[in-house]
């Protein structure tokens, strides 16, 4: 069960849901960029502690330049995403911000097809369309 991608994806979704709630509460009284920096520091320490307890330190030296570059770019994209997300949480309701943030799924599907040459089928198109529709329905606030 712990070797299943679905198990890990569901755990990720659960933790991401908690993240939105904790972040909304945490960003209430401070600058959103400072809140992001604090969160990032916690993530850095926490993930290094886990990685170093499970992976030999010597394996870090074996990482290729290409891998470092791609992970570095991923880190920059993550940082930019978090900065935007925390600002959105500071300005909006979690129940509206989180669905829009999850449009990242649609962007990832499209980019996977364009950059990674993954083949998309009708399920990707239908699912992506439903995600967009769902995000818009959840984020839309009718005029009072």
Locations of regions flagged by a protein language model:
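Membrane-interface interhelical linkers
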Residues: 1-11, 28-30, 42-72, 82-91, ...
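Hydrophobic/aromatic positions within or immediately flanking transmembrane alpha-helices
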Residues: 9, 36-37, 71, 98-101, ...
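Hydrophobic/small/kink-forming positions within alpha-helical transmembrane segments
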Residues: 13, 17, 21, 48, ...
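Juxtamembrane helix-loop-helix junctions in multi-pass membrane proteins
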Residues: 18-42
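Hydrophobic/aromatic residues within transmembrane alpha-helices
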Residues: 26, 35, 88, 114-116
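Helix-helix packing/entry segments at the starts of transmembrane helices
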Residues: 34-41, 83, 89-109
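Hydrophobic transmembrane alpha-helices of multi-pass small-molecule transport proteins
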Residues: 47, 123-140
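C-terminal transmembrane-helix exit sites in multi-pass transporters
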Residues: 106-124
